[in-house]
Swiss-Prot record:
It catalyses: a 4-hydroxy-3-methoxy-5-(all-trans-polyprenyl)benzoate + H(+) = a 2-methoxy-6-(all-trans-polyprenyl)phenol + CO2. It comes from Leishmania major. This is Ubiquinone biosynthesis protein COQ4 homolog, mitochondrial. Component of a multi-subunit COQ enzyme complex. Keywords: Lyase, Membrane, Metal-binding, Mitochondrion, Mitochondrion inner membrane, Ubiquinone biosynthesis, Zinc. The keyword Amino-acid biosynthesis does not apply. It is an enzyme of class 4 (lyase). The keyword Metal-binding applies. GO terms for biological process: ubiquinone biosynthetic process.
């Protein structure tokens, strides 16, 4: 993950400045217009009774840069829920974990899939194929040397809070899962 961040201009900047998403970002987001990315973030966090400060600190990683990369991975998880349009059902959480695995290569996403699979009905399990396709289409990619879909750790989410949600979607190139599923139903 560190190498992917170092290979991207925005990622290098994030590693240099190491922004931390704190409770003040959530407080700021609560006052934003309903059409903004930040408002959706605040609504998600409040609905689930989450606080950015509630995440357990990264431990057992001696290298400070690698420790920050893991901190960023954890802090960006809530932003991934917002940009992908996924809630917190088991199915949606598994979709997010597949998405994260496609972006980071961390096996945690696949392990979550294995752990969550027994809790899924046959119909829900059938949806996993669609989620896999969606995550694959939203994996980091580039066109003509420029990121078409950046690795989500390289997105300056903390700078996106006041932007319109649709603008952030366009910036990231990520298709929210509900939009993907709606298009699939039409075809």
């Amino acid at each position: 993950m560190k190498n992917c961040m170092m290979a991207d201009q925005r990622g290098r900047s994030i590693l240099q400045y190491q922004p931390i998403v704190g409770d003040e970002a959530l407080e700021f987001s609560r006052g934003l217009a309903p059409s903004t990315f930040g408002f959706r973030y605040a609504a998600y966090m409040d609905r689930n009774h989450f606080l950015p400060s509630g995440r357990t600190a990264v431990k057992h990683i001696a290298d400070p840069t690698l420790a920050y990369v893991m901190t960023r991975y954890r802090q960006c998880h809530d932003f991934v829920h917002i940009i992908t349009g996924c809630g917190r059902s088991i199915e949606e959480e598994l979709a997010v974990k597949i998405f994260e695995w496609k972006h980071t290569g961390l096996p945690l996403g696949l392990l979550s899939l294995l752990g969550g699979a027994p809790r899924l009905s046959a119909a829900q399990w059938a949806h996993i194929r669609l989620y896999w396709e969606w995550a694959s289409r939203n994996a980091p990619s580039s066109r003509h040397g420029e990121p078409a879909v950046p690795m989500y750790l390289n997105v300056p989410w903390e700078d996106m809070l006041a932007k319109e949600y649709d603008e952030v979607v366009a910036y990231t190139g990520i298709t929210p899962l509900p939009d993907f599923l709606e298009k699939r139903q039409k075809h």
